[in-house]
């Protein structure tokens, strides 16, 4: 599909809203998860989610940014869980409508979180990956940023002000508290137990770490530890 590009080599793709034919093309290429960032009210969009087995919708207003940062971080974690749980040859496709701003914003935050790099570096990578699409050659998109200024500012500030930080040094650490950190994982734990398929993926991802089959981000490692710790504590409490 010439309107898309990889953001995780051979595993994760981002691009524009797919037509029915492109959905079939993506499935043939190994895509097993579709992540949709569009809203229900958007015009000239042909719904496809009933044609695919696995579909997640996290709507962001066209040209806008996520309104709830905690829910957005939960969503980023869900995307990482899906990518981490992909089998050989399997892929995930994340898209907005045009495949530029909203998807670029999500991928920039995703890369900063999973690779432990600065927002500046993640934005550069998104611009690089975005410019490599065949349909953008010799167009303004080959040179310009896929994100608008508001979306770029969101990425730049997201990790500097949010209570849960990645491995790089955030600009503002005053908002970070241990109690906030624990409370965040409590909420994520509850949410994952409401989504058994994702819960199984995050627990099984521990096998990848043991086998050395690829890096798992610090945040995902901490979450897995918290879930297992809470399960073990319940067993101890029941037996005591």
UniProtKB/Swiss-Prot annotation:
Coiled coil: none annotated. The keyword Hydrolase applies. This is Putative tyrosine phosphatase 067L. Its EC number is 3.1.3.48. Belongs to the protein-tyrosine phosphatase family. InterPro entries: Prot-tyrosine_phosphatase-like, PTP-SAK, Tyr_Pase_AS, Tyr_Pase_dom, TYR_PHOSPHATASE_DUAL_dom. It holds the Pfam family PTP-SAK.
């Amino acid at each position: 599909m010439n309107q898309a590009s990889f953001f995780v080599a051979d595993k994760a793709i981002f691009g524009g809203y797919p037509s029915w034919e492109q959905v079939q093309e993506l499935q043939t290429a190994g895509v097993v998860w579709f992540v949709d960032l569009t809203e229900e009210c958007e015009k000239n969009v042909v719904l496809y989610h009933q044609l695919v087995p696995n579909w997640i919708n996290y709507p962001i207003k066209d040209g806008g940014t996520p309104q709830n940062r905690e829910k957005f971080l939960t969503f980023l974690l869900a995307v990482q869980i899906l990518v981490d749980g992909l089998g050989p040859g399997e892929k995930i496709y994340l898209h907005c409508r045009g495949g530029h701003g909203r998807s670029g914003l999500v991928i920039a935050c995703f890369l900063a979180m999973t690779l432990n790099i600065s927002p500046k570096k993640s934005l550069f990578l998104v611009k690089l990956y975005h410019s490599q699409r065949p349909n953008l050659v010799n167009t303004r998109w080959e040179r310009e940023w896929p994100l608008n200024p508001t979306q770029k500012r969101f990425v730049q500030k997201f990790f500097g002000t949010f209570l849960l930080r990645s491995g790089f040094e955030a600009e503002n650490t005053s908002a970070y508290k241990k109690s906030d950190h624990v409370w965040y994982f409590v909420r994520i734990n509850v949410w994952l137990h409401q989504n058994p398929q994702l819960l199984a993926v995050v627990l099984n991802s521990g096998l990848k770490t043991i086998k050395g089959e690829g890096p798992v981000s610090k945040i995902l490692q901490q979450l897995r530890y918290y879930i297992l710790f809470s399960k073990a504590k319940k067993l101890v409490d029941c037996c005591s």
